[in-house]
């Protein structure tokens, strides 16, 4: 190899900082930088890679002493001007840098031997009674490539890798308090008198001692908060400035701390580096692992006498027992509502004050508390940190995981005292009980309408705003909520995941299955307060009540026809627009709505799902079954206004009325 063409210069290993970056470093980091620069230069000189020209300034005047171009304020602190003797030829050099350059003139001193000798030199500083270590063939005039250490008996060459050097006296790569790796002796020279901890550098000891003295010299000019290190102050100030210099290369999300972006990127890579030694479960963050390990390690001595559930603390047990006793000691002075926990009351009171101080920087939404904001942000990041150990499914919320796990166990410990139904969790039980109590705690601030469920209110409010944020990727239709979109998408996929355990019929929606099962059970939960008639569906109940009050509020703007239900008006308007979006896959016919398409498909399948309980006859359509049952009941609901004659079908009445008009 031609050394004149391939040798390394000091600039190849020099570490430079800009003026701005140098200002950010604290004293410890600056001194450490100087140590590393001096050692790098000494290494280069020792292997003959530094070729300083006469008119070229020494590194001490360029960048070693400070590390920033045109900044030399720390030069005197490095003590590089003291005369130094050469251990090989006893020459006296001006300073340590000239000594390092001079050492390069001794060709036998390879980089490995230099490091090895440096180790013994450090040992000599701590063991004054020992003699100076010597090397075989340690002569200026001998240029052998193989050099042997008398103290360790180890051979060295100039061609092997520096990083593979293993020193017998205890040298090891060491990472100091600020994370810069350097070679350090196994013995530390500076000890803390408070805790006995050892350090290799005096300035590192000084920084450590701030922990004991509680010295915090760095103050935030915005809020006055004090910090031990300048780097901590810089991180804190980003809270005031909103600066987020660390950006995720996958999704573009920005973070104020590098640690946060590293943790966030594990979501994209799927990395879960923290594994539980007990059960093998892996986690994204160490805090999640520590929290999980309490399941294995911490005892649960407090057992509920009602259900046998065990808790870590008595406070948790007392809070849990309120579920069984129904105790709600915390009352809202605005609306009189009571809560089991004070935290629930505090959260509820923000409903009255309208306070939402926590802001999502992704979508601009405001939230009542930081926990809700953090949980909401998982919608944007896609993070699902909770995993089911039975099926491996991941969940965004811990409560959803707990609820899901009961699917595997079949556990339904919460019973409704009114109807005897069992539920998986208390929240579902409380929501169900509103059916019996009639409670509707959620009010629309636009029209004053009350709702039983929060999600129903949110859905209703989109009627006022016109918002339909959920779009179908197949047909481009927009929907007010994700559930409706998912149900709609099953029209395209043909998926029917909800199956009736009685007759095996499958449905697209869970609510449709629940309604269908009332055919088998005979349940009719909706009663008309006017005539006492019961109905299987709430929609039929509402439509029936309009007959009592003559209410017809939905008018067609094309022909003036009035309808009692908005859905009927929408269906009717398709007569004018001739819109038929639903196509039969068998014969290619188009229909105005999905229900008509489903009814039509029975022509091809031969399905007749509606059976008469009296005679067992089956029908394709529910309307046909209703007409047929009037034969058994004798019901004739259609009366002629002219002669008073009654009929069991509307078509028969219309046919009869022609007699009077002739």
Curated annotation (Swiss-Prot):
GO terms for cellular component: nucleus. GO terms for biological process: regulation of transcription by RNA polymerase II. SMART domains: KRAB (SM00349), ZnF_C2H2 (SM00355). InterPro entries: KRAB, KRAB_dom_sf, Znf_C2H2_sf, Znf_C2H2_type. Keywords: DNA-binding, Metal-binding, Nucleus, Repeat, Transcription, Transcription regulation, Zinc, Zinc-finger. Residues 8-101 form the KRAB domain. GO terms for molecular function: DNA-binding transcription factor activity, RNA polymerase II-specific; RNA polymerase II cis-regulatory region sequence-specific DNA binding; zinc ion binding. A zinc finger (C2H2-type) spans 190-212, 218-240, 246-268, 274-296, 302-324, 358-380, 386-408, 414-436, 442-464, 470-492, 498-520, 526-548, 554-576, 582-604, 610-632, 638-660. It holds the Pfam family zf-C2H2. It comes from the Eukaryota. It is found in: Nucleus. PANTHER family: ZINC FINGER PROTEIN, ZINC FINGER PROTEIN 544-RELATED. Belongs to the krueppel C2H2-type zinc-finger protein family. May be involved in transcriptional regulation. This is Zinc finger protein 17. It comes from Homo sapiens (Human).
């Amino acid at each position: 190899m031609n050394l004149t063409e391939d040798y390394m210069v000091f600039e190849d290993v020099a570490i430079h900082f800009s003026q701005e970056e140098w200002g950010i470093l604290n004293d410890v980091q600056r001194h450490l930088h100087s140590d590393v620069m001096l050692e790098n230069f000494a290494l280069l000189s020792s292997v003959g890679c530094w070729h300083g020209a006469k008119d070229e300034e020494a590194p001490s005047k360029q960048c070693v002493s400070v590390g920033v171009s045109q900044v030399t304020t720390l030069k005197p602190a490095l003590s590089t001007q003291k005369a130094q003797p050469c251990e090989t030829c006893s020459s006296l050099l001006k300073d340590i840098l000239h000594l390092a350059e001079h050492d390069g003139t001794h060709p036998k001193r390879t980089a490995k031997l230099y490091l090895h000798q440096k180790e013994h030199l450090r040992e000599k500083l701590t063991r004054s009674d020992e003699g100076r270590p010597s090397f075989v063939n340690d002569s200026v005039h001998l240029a052998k490539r193989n050099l042997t250490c008398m103290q360790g008996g180890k051979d060295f060459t100039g061609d092997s890798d520096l990083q593979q050097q293993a020193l017998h006296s205890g040298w090891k790569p060491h990472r100091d308090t600020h994370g810069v790796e350097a070679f350090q002796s196994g013995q530390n020279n500076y000890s803390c008198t408070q805790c006995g901890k050892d350090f290799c550098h005096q300035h590192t000891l000084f920084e450590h001692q701030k922990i004991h003295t509680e010295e915090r010299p760095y103050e935030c000019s915005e809020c006055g908060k004090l910090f031990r290190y300048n780097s901590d102050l810089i991180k804190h100030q980003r809270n005031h400035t909103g600066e987020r210099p660390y950006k995720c290369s996958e999704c573009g999300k920005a973070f104020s701390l590098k640690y946060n972006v590293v943790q966030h990127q594990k979501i994209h890579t799927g990395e879960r580096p923290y594994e539980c030694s007990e059960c093998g479960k892996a986690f994204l963050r160490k805090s999640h692992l520590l929290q999980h390990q309490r399941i294995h390690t911490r005892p649960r001595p407090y057992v509920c006498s009602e259900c046998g559930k065990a808790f870590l603390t008595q406070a948790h047990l007392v809070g849990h027992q309120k579920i069984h006793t129904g105790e709600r000691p915390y009352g809202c002075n605005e609306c009189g509502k009571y809560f089991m926990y004070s935290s629930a009351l505090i959260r509820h009171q923000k409903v009255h004050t309208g306070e939402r101080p926590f802001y999502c920087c992704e979508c601009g939404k405001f939230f009542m508390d930081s926990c809700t904001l953090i949980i909401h942000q998982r919608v944007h990041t896609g993070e699902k940190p909770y995993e089911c150990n039975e099926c491996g499914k991941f969940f965004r919320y811990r409560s959803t995981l707990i609820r899901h796990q009961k699917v595997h166990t079949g556990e339904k410990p919460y019973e409704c005292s009114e109807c005897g139904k069992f539920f998986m969790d208390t929240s579902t039980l409380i929501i169900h009980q509103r059916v019996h109590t009639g409670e509707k705690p959620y009010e629309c601030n636009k029209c004053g309408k009350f709702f039983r469920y929060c999600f129903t209110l949110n859905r209703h409010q989109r009627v006022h705003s016109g918002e339909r944020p959920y779009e179908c990727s197949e047909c481009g239709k927009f929907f007010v909520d994700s559930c409706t979109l998912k149900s709609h998408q099953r029209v395209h996929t043909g998926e029917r995941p909800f199956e009736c355990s009685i007759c095996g019929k499958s449905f697209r929606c869970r609510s449709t299955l629940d309604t269908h099962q009332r055919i088998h059970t005979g349940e009719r939960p909706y009663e008309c307060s006017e005539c006492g008639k019961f109905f299987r569906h709430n929609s039929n109940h509402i439509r029936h009540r309009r007959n009592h009050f003559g209410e017809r509020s939905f008018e067609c703007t094309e022909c003036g026809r009035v309808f009692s239900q908005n859905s009927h008006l929408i269906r009717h308007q398709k007569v004018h627009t001739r819109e038929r979006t639903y196509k039969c896959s068998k014969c290619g016919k188009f229909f105005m709505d999905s229900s008509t398409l489903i009814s039509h498909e029975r022509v091809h399948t031969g399905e007749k799902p509606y059976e008469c309980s009296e005679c067992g006859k089956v029908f394709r359509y529910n309307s046909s079954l209703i007409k047929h049952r009037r034969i058994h009941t004798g019901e004739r609901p259609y009366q002629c206004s002219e002669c008073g004659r009654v009929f069991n079908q509307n078509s028969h009445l219309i046919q009869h009325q022609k007699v009077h008009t002739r």
